Amino acid sequence: YLQSQERYESQKEICQVAKEYRRRGTGLDGIVLDWCSWEDGMWGQKSFDHSRFPDPSNMIQTLHDEDVHFMISIWPNMDPKCENHKEMKEKNLLLPFSDIYNARTEQARKCYWEQAKRGLYQYGVDAWWCDSSEPFTPEWSHTERVEPALQYEEYKRTAGDYLGEEHTNDFALYHARAIYEGQRSEEKG
């Protein structure tokens, strides 16, 4: 069983949830730290907010001691205040007119992985949830439910404006590839 909720607020909360599953004898294979693992206002930064997750290595080891794997959500978009964003921008690795890295280029994928490695993987992260892999999602701003066919057309048009219509479905593949190839390169050594 993989446990996830909208998000966990702290290292303490995650460890308590895993411990409670074990106390009850309920199966738990992994726990997901969804959005906001980063510092407040740093959306998409690939690092832990050390005020809420003061010792990520210890947190993950505590989970491993309970035979629980740790998965974290990572995002392709980064707030301009983030160090990750600044690095991507300085290296010209963002998609034009956006805060989303250009996963279709090898250099951007390698940079993205290095950021994930530095800020997250080094602590023992087991798995990745590549969130928002359809990075241009106009439905987030809707106030009313839109009929699915119209919503799909709106997505195609919006994503096509940024990626080119022929590439609206391949971003997720390249985004996942950044993590897959990056992590595999670490495990070969």
Predicted segment positions?
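Catalytic-domain carbohydrate-binding cleft regions of carbohydrate-active enzymes
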Residues: 1-189
